């Protein structure tokens, strides 16, 4: 691969990453914070705490707050041609909650905040075969076991976050590379960015679901 081909690939990935983040923002508002994938069912996803939109290096808008994407300034930035480059996301699935920052251009997450809650099965698991120990030894071993359990639980939940994002990205690519992008997504996006517009969520959902149902396995 030549240097120019590598640069071209990087630039395309940056563009796709911004479109993906814009699509997540759009769907999270249209579906009122409840998204779904075939593999994971329904879960909560919305923008929280911060969003950064830009057009080139000079025109940058940074918005912070409980729900920055819902501000008038955020939508006006889109109308001026800016696209989201970074956003804080809140993910809620099953009994778990996670917050993190999604960076569109490298398509990566950072600052993952993931409270670790051990499941009942782990808490009630039978202890290893007892051995005579002093009080300090037993306490140290218990703390070590709890630390290991918390570590593996965090790793498991981190992977679940990644899998949900990967599933959403697959859905996005299916729409982006198919006729549904022009026929359904772009018109809905245009209506969504219009201050006077109102997206027909049911019609959009039906169109996107039809497109996703025809995806090749």
Where are these regions (language model features)?
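Intrinsically disordered, low-complexity, charge-rich terminal extensions
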Residues: 1-217
